[in-house]
Structures are given as C-alpha cells and as structure tokens.
C-alpha cells in the first residue's frame, strides 16, 4: 500500500528538471514500501515514491527519469512522471501508479488498475486490478502483462525525447517538462462508471 503521506502531498509543486543524484548516499530501492494505485486512482498528483532513494541504476537501464508530455503520435498531451532508483521503476500518470521492482512491502510486479471503474456499490468504486513487470532490455523498458504475458508497452529514449509504444499500437513521442501542467494535477475519470446501489 502506498504511504499515505505520499498520496497526501503535492507532487505538482516540484521541479522535475531537478533529479535526485543516484550516489548510494541514501536508501536503496528495496528499503522503500511499494506504491500501488489507491482504489481506482489517486485524487491529486502525489509526491514521488522514490524521493529518498539514491541507488545507482543497473547497466541495462537507461535514465528516463523525469516528467514527460506527449507531443506527437497517439497520445498527444499525455503527461507521466517516471522515477528510477536501482532496478525499480515507478510511472505515475492519470490517477495511476505503476511501481515495479524490489521494495520493502510487496512483490516485484505492479499492483494497479487500468483506471476504469467496473461498478460503484454504495458510493465505493470498484476497478479491475492489473499487474505487469517492467524489464530493461537493451536500454528499452518493456512492460509484460502479469509478469509473464505478452509485451504491452515499450519506453525508450531517442535523443532528448522519450518514445512510448502502447498496446493499442500507438507510438507517442514525448518531451521533458519541469512542472506538472495545471490540467494534470487532478486526474480525469477514466472509463465507464456504473452505479449498482
């Protein structure tokens, strides 16, 4: 479960062009609790999960840390924050937290949701939970459904841009941002919402 202080904090107030130095002076990835998507999604852009982590990246990883916005391709305007520390990667976007890698409280794979609400019962939303692994292969971050299934997402750098290949076949080129845009501080509801009782 994500640290409540992380969810209560204002991650939109930070400058994401000022990245932590990964010099082994602080915590290791495995020392920090796992960050999962709370319920069907967070209510406000949260603080970084790995802010106290300074473990260097493994040789097979590229450094894609920071805040990114889609500028061309399938998901123009999409904004996501990528954190990395050691072998751990956290992608935070649109109400969702994808956290993969060694941690102090849970398994390696992500424990999150696609974001759409299957139904609401007595005012409480219920979403289908999902899981994926994030594996570095030749400086490309590949997401595999459930940790053993097909590759559904790829992220890699081309020059100063981040390239995001998604399961729907789209390819999005992304630029680096320093600040969270106002319209991305509070996530928009995703998918259907069916009220049962």
Cite the ranges covered by each PLM segment:
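A short acidic/glycine-rich loop-to-helix N-cap element
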Residues: 153, 172-173
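Short, exposed beta-strand-loop hairpins at the edges of beta-sheets
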Residues: 161-169
């Amino acid at each position: 479960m994500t640290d409540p202080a992380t969810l209560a904090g204002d991650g939109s107030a930070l400058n994401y062009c000022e990245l932590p130095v990964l010099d082994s002076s602080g915590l290791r990835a495995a020392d920090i609790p796992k960050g999962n998507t709370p319920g069907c999604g967070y209510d406000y852009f949260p603080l970084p999960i790995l802010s106290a982590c300074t473990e260097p990246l493994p040789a097979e990883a590229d450094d894609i840390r920071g805040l990114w916005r889609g500028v061309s391709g399938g998901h123009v305007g999409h904004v996501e924050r990528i954190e990395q520390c050691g072998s751990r990667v956290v992608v935070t976007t649109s109400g969702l937290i994808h956290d993969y890698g060694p941690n102090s409280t849970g398994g390696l794979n992500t424990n999150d949701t696609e974001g759409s609400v299957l139904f609401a019962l007595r005012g409480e939303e219920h979403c289908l939970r999902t899981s994926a692994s994030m594996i570095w292969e030749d400086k490309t971050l590949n997401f595999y459904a459930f940790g053993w299934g097909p590759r559904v997402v790829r992220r890699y750098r081309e020059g100063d841009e981040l390239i995001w290949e998604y399961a729907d076949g789209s390819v999005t080129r992304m630029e680096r941002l320093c600040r969270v845009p106002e319209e991305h501080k509070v996530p928009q509801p995703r998918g259907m919402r069916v009220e049962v009782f």
